[in-house]
Regions:
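Glycine-rich Rossmann-fold phosphate-binding loop(s) that bind the pyrophosphate
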Residues: 19-20, 48, 117
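Iron-sulfur cluster-binding cysteine motifs and their immediate structural context
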Residues: 489-520, 527-549
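A short alpha-helix-loop-beta-strand transition element characteristic
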Residues: 71-87, 138, 204-212, 368
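Predominantly flavin-linked oxidoreductase catalytic cores and closely associated redox partners
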Residues: 127-288, 348, 352
Length: 553
């Protein structure tokens, strides 16, 4: 159908895919550089969510170092970072007890702020628009466009009003081609176009395999007596076993609200493990449940995290564009922070891209994209590189298990201060770590009580999902039968457990199992694209404005 459609086009100096912290920081920095150099440049940001911040999900405890550089007067301009961290606690949990651990430098949040990433992103969008950046929410970047020489020309937004059969409906609107001298991919973790770019330009050929986590988060309203504004708690241990990397957080922010979340490394081995159920179980711990008893859950969401760090970063630039933020993988996993690193990567990219921008009024056009090759050098000379270098050995050490990994981390961070004369390797791709079901023990999860613990469907309701049912599937199976022949028969259908939204379901049809995909439940976490054992599932963007609206998450 695409071949027969005529799409309109628009020309910009820079097109940015994704209105998250990195995309908006890049847009703001580019406009600042243009003003400083007395130039006018056009910058366009496309965002698949219904508004800037709709798909933004993080803890979030924010280190303001990058924001201080980008917008020094952010306090005067009303940035929604108002709840400073007042106390840090680190716990190791057993089934019944909690042990206080020393607060290591990675968990020292003095000077940081507990905030809603969605609110911060909306504020950044306002700052960008005030500088003349054009932001188009509700438009999913569906295709990368290329010049004849293979360099990136821009992107095309997805068609709207296409039916489930792939044919135009009465409300059909073709996508728009957005051409640019430079295209910045800021899609976040496991971005669908970023994934294509990395593969096409072989940007990861000198990198170690990327590794990921799944983060699941709820927001609760609790009583004033239980609310401790500014308190930040991180925990390790129970309910996960000693072979599985993960942990939890509890953040007390404003208005009697508490954010609680759980992260599981997607290199886990047991196909019977359910990150969602482990999260619900975590809340039943005596030390944790006392905060939430009598409270009310008001929001829910989930998102994959990119955990590989420095040694898993791909090459950052290619002809016609760059990767920024979590699309590349700048998360500092030991600190459980990626917002300030995403913003800094974007600022460095903007500084590398800006000198390449020609005045299009003085040239007839362009038929090739230039490469911002010094983006890599700028990164390596920045505090961002130093921070990721110091953190590089923590995540891969957990391939030895939680106890040895924790011991190594203590030595690496407290004695070597992240400057050990070696760099550890990751142990392979996450989907390859899953063991066959026959070699693993099923895990018995209790039924939720609907008060402290919940099921997936009631949780997804709180993610404020929007999804047009009559549209093509955005969860594409290379071979549908593989979901039965391999996933069901050999791995006991792990997607029915790792998906935090109940998208994947085994149903009986004529006495035989069939995979049913409930695409309308999808919260865009991308876990299936990462963890499927044969990489049979590909996540692509659904129609623009689909998915969650996280609001104050």
């Amino acid at each position: 159908m695409t071949e027969s459609i005529t799409r309109d086009s628009m020309q910009y100096d820079v097109v940015i895919v994704g209105a998250g912290p990195s995309g908006l920081s890049a847009a703001i920095k580019l406009k600042q550089l243009a003003e400083k150099n007395g130039r006018e440049i056009s910058v366009c940001v496309v965002e698949k969510g219904s508004e800037a911040g709709a798909h933004s999900l993080a803890g979030a405890v924010i280190d303001p170092i990058a924001l201080n550089e980008l917008i020094p007067d952010w306090k005067e301009k009303g940035a929604p970072l108002t709840r400073a961290v007042t106390q840090d606690k680190v716990l190791f949990l057993t089934e019944k007890k909690a042990f206080n651990l020393p607060v290591t430098p990675n968990f020292d949040n003095h000077g940081n702020y507990i905030a809603s990433l969605g609110e911060v992103v909306r504020w950044l969008a306002e700052q960008a628009e005030n500088m003349g950046v054009e932001i188009y929410p509700g438009f999913a970047a569906a295709e990368v466009l290329y010049h004849e020489d293979g360099s990136v020309k821009g992107i095309a937004t997805g068609n709207m009003g296409v039916g489930k059969d792939g044919e135009p409906t009465d409300s059909f609107q073709p996508g728009m081609e957005l051409w640019a001298q430079q295209t910045l991919f800021a899609e976040g973790c496991r971005g669908s176009l970023s994934k294509q770019i990395i593969e096409r330009f072989q940007l990861d050929q000198n990198s170690q395999p990327q590794t990921y986590g799944l983060g699941i988060k709820e927001i609760w309203e609790v009583s004033s007596e239980k609310h401790q504004p500014g308190l930040v708690i991180h925990s390790a241990g129970w309910p996960l076993d000693s072979k599985t990397y993960g942990g939890a957080f509890v953040y007390h922010f404003d208005d009697n609200k508490v954010a609680v979340g759980f992260v599981v490394g997607l290199d886990y081995q047991n196909p019977y493990l359910s990150p969602f159920e482990e999260f619900q179980r975590f809340k039943t711990h005596p030390e944790i449940r006392k905060t939430f008893e009598g409270g009310r859950r008001i929001a829910y969401g989930a998102r994959s995290l990119i955990e590989g760090g420095l040694q898993s970063l791909p090459k950052l630039s290619f002809k016609g564009g760059v990767l920024i933020g979590d699309a590349a993988g700048f998360l500092n996993m030991p600190r459980i922070k990626g917002i300030h690193t995403a913003m800094k990567s974007a600022m460095l990219a903007a500084e590398a891209v800006f000198p390449l921008l020609e005045n299009l009024e003085e040239v007839e056009g362009f038929d090739s994209g230039k490469e911002a090759a010094d983006y890599q050098q700028r990164f390596e000379q920045s505090w961002l590189y130093q921070e990721l270098y110091a953190a590089r050995n923590v995540r891969p050490s957990f391939k030895w298990g939680v106890y040895l990994g924790s011991l190594y981390t203590g030595i690496d961070q407290m004695i070597f201060r992240g400057k050990a004369p070696w760099t550890l390797k990751h142990h392979g791709k996450d989907n390859e770590q899953l063991k066959k079901a026959a070699a693993c023990k099923p895990i018995d999860y209790r039924k939720p009580d609907g008060v402290l613990t919940f099921d997936r469907l009631s949780s997804v309701f709180l993610a404020n999902l929007a999804h047009e049912e009559n549209q093509p599937d955005h969860l594409v199976l290379k071979n549908p039968q593989t979901m039965i022949d391999v996933n069901y028969k050999e791995y006991a259908s792990p997607e029915t457990r790792y998906c935090p939204a109940g998208v994947y379901e085994i149903v009986e049809e004529n006495g035989s199992p069939r995979m049913q995909i409930n695409a309308a439940n999808c919260v865009h976490c991308k876990t299936c694209d990462i963890k499927d054992p044969t990489q049979n599932i590909t996540w692509i963007c659904p129609e623009g404005a689909s998915g969650p609206n996280y609001g104050g998450m």
